[in-house]
Amino acid sequence: MKFSFFALKTMLIELSESQTRQQLDASSVFTALLEARAEAAVVRGSMIWREIDGRRYLIRTSTAGAQKSLGPESSETQTIAAKFFDRKERAAERLRQLTEQVVVMQRMNRALRVGRVPNVVVETLNALEKAGVAEHFLVVGTHALYAYESAAGVRIPDGAMATRDVDLFFDTRKGVKLFSSLGRLDSSMIALLQKVDKTFRVRHSSKYTAVNAAGFEVDIIRRVARDGDPHPLRMSDDEDDLWAAQVSSGDNILGARPFEE
């Protein structure tokens, strides 16, 4: 079904005062959750004391198993360790509380019919955020309209939003950073999607598409290769991973100011 801009404008449904208030509250809590995740990421891993040649050293360990000495035991390194564990504990508690609060907000959203983005889309974007790779992707196409209706406090007619796929535009200029991030996680794009829904599979006839058992598709698209862009482009070293499909509108998408809500 196609709609003209005028038709859409005349068919828009304004949210009620209670819906608008709930939408703002939910947005505020989710923003705080993203900040809490970032804070928790800074203090991932741990610190340990290790004896080397008769002296104790403070060692910073990462989740990947890397270790770095912060120096021999002293009042300074003891303070560093104490501050680290205090910060880690506070970050974990804040993350726990906000995660619980987001669940409450999701229930209220459903009760008031606010925040109607399909769950599979929300969970996919959350998976990218948790993996630290969300910054490399931009939602384009029909599902991007949800951000606009949220900002405007209106609802777009369901007929204009009916689609069974979401397009994720990948900025190839940030390719190295994405590949490094996935490498550190020992993961791939299809593996991230399978954390959302284990039935996601790469479609053999179109390697840029992942489809789940319900028929919902996630498409990875990119600009037409130029300026040394890698092509063809697989999203990770995994031979069974998704590939990015070139779209002629890619440069226009990159040149446009992204909308954030």
List the predicted regions and their residue ranges.
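Compositionally biased terminal segments of proteins
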Residues: 1-56, 62-64, 69-261
